[in-house]
Amino acid sequence: MLDWRLASAHFLLAMILMLWGSGKAFSVDLASEASEFGAESLQSPPTTREEKSATELAAKLLLLDDLVSLENDVFETKKKRSFSGFGSPLDRLSAGSVEHRGKQRRVVDHSKKRFGIPMDRIGRNRLSSSRG
């Protein structure tokens, strides 16, 4: 792994040296170019297009800030309510799944239900195999 890194580093250095020697490499002085660019930008006043884009950008940022503040107002944390009988407070989102007071429970008719016959009173041979 180290040999591969060393070989690739030598190859890159050789390519840079060849390009620099042939004059095809970038021979621009970056410090002088940066100072010229800085002086040029300070001398020329911003154009109307740049001013327009800056004001549009500021307006968009203010709009986004307003939207974020509205979103924070909407998504406030819910207050907790406590229910009698449970002893622990629940938030309002999970309260709907727990609360069953409003629902009426199904009434089961016990008159048709067959109760088992005691085995000590009747012999096993008298019981039918089917309940029909």
Curated annotation (Swiss-Prot):
Sequence positions bearing Arginine amide: R131
Induction note: Is down-regulated by 1,25-dihydroxy vitamin D3.
Cellular location(s): Secreted
GO biological process, any: negative regulation of D-glucose import
A GO term for molecular function: hormone activity
Disulfide bonds: none
Statement: the UniProt record of this protein carries the keyword Membrane: no
Tissue localization of expression: Highly expressed in skeletal muscle. Also expressed in leg tendons/ligaments and osteoblasts. In long bones and teeth, present in knee joint and periodontal ligaments (at protein level).
Regions that span the bilayer: none
Signal peptide: 1-25
Main localization category: secreted
The protein's role, per its UniProt record: Hormone that acts as a ligand for natriuretic peptide receptor NPR3/NPR-C and promotes bone growth and physical endurance in muscle. Acts as a regulator of osteoblast differentiation and bone growth by binding to natriuretic peptide receptor NPR3/NPR-C, thereby preventing binding between NPR3/NPR-C and natriuretic peptides, leading to increase cGMP production. Required to enhance physical endurance: induced following physical exercise in muscle and promotes cGMP production, probably by interacting with NPR3/NPR-C.
Protein name listed in UniProt: Osteocrin
Organism: Rattus norvegicus
Encoding gene per record: Ostn
